[in-house]
Amino acid sequence: MSRYRGPRMKMIRRPGTLPGLTSKTPGTKVGSSDRSTSSKKISQYRIRLEEKQKLRLHYGLTERQLLKYVFTARGAKGSTGQLLLQLLEMRLDNTIFRLGIVPTIPAARQLVNHRHVSINEHIIDIPSYNCKPGDVITINNREKCRLVDRRDMNSLQKPEIPNHLTFDSKEFLGSVQQIIDRDWIDLKINELLVVEYYSRRV
């Protein structure tokens, strides 16, 4: 399954707010939720599937990419669900998003793909790069990033930077202090349902 590139508002109507995909929130038609819940009982499979889709859309992953992260989390010591979220949160594109430099993860991915991002003074053009404690992130094309910031986030309240990151807005420099804590992940998700979904399929 490829990465979704269609209208973002259309895709968040069912899963709800996905801050990584879009800063907008879905509207709800009067009576629509009542009809959907009362017409038929939602199966456990569908609940797990929708939670998996929420995770995939938020971080902008293909099905194959998400499955790879699930396998990696399974092979590590600790809670598979929490490790899965930490792996996704420490991606470079998500880290740039969480620093508040750009309003969405797709915008962060574009910066990385266009080679505007350096880590420890080396240009990195891989959005999935796994950021580690001690990494220093700089934006090479500072003027472009300021324009993106001014255009897309001027009317928005910038999110609080999580405790594992620091950001110097004057130098446009971010640093990774530690692995993110579960409490600082801003996506409302039940990661155990995602783990259960894959445990029944692979």
Swiss-Prot record:
The cellular location(s) given in this protein's UniProt record come to: Plastid
TM spans (from-to): none
**Where does the UniProt entry say this protein principally localizes?**
plastid
Span of domain S4 RNA-binding: 90-153
Recorded hits in InterPro entries, A to Z, give: Ribosomal_uS4 (IPR022801), Ribosomal_uS4_bac-type (IPR005709), Ribosomal_uS4_CS (IPR018079), Ribosomal_uS4_N (IPR001912), S4_RNA-bd (IPR002942), S4_RNA-bd_sf (IPR036986)
Molecular function (GO) terms for this protein are: rRNA binding; structural constituent of ribosome
Query: GO CC annotation: what is one?
Result: plastid
Compositionally biased tracts (Low complexity): 29-41
Q: Which residue ranges does the record annotate as region Disordered?
A: 1-41
GO biological process per UniProt: ribosomal small subunit biogenesis; translation
The superkingdom of the source organism is Eukaryota
UniProt keywords, alphabetically:
Plastid, Ribonucleoprotein, Ribosomal protein, RNA-binding, rRNA-binding
SUPFAM superfamilies in UniProt: Alpha-L RNA-binding motif
**Compositionally biased residues, Basic residues:** 1-13
Name the Pfam families on file.
Ribosomal_S4 (PF00163), S4 (PF01479)
CDD domains, alphabetized: S4
Q: Which PANTHER family match?
A: 30S 40S RIBOSOMAL PROTEIN, SMALL RIBOSOMAL SUBUNIT PROTEIN US4M
Q: What does the UniProt function comment say about this protein?
A: One of the primary rRNA binding proteins, it binds directly to 16S rRNA where it nucleates assembly of the body of the 30S subunit.
The annotated subunit structure for this chain is: Part of the 30S ribosomal subunit. Contacts protein S5. The interaction surface between S4 and S5 is involved in control of translational fidelity.
The text of the family note is: Belongs to the universal ribosomal protein uS4 family.
What protein name applies here?
Small ribosomal subunit protein uS4c
Q: Which organism is it from?
A: Aneura mirabilis
From the broadest rank down, the organism's phylogenetic lineage runs: Eukaryota, Viridiplantae, Streptophyta, Embryophyta, Marchantiophyta
Which gene produces this protein?
rps4
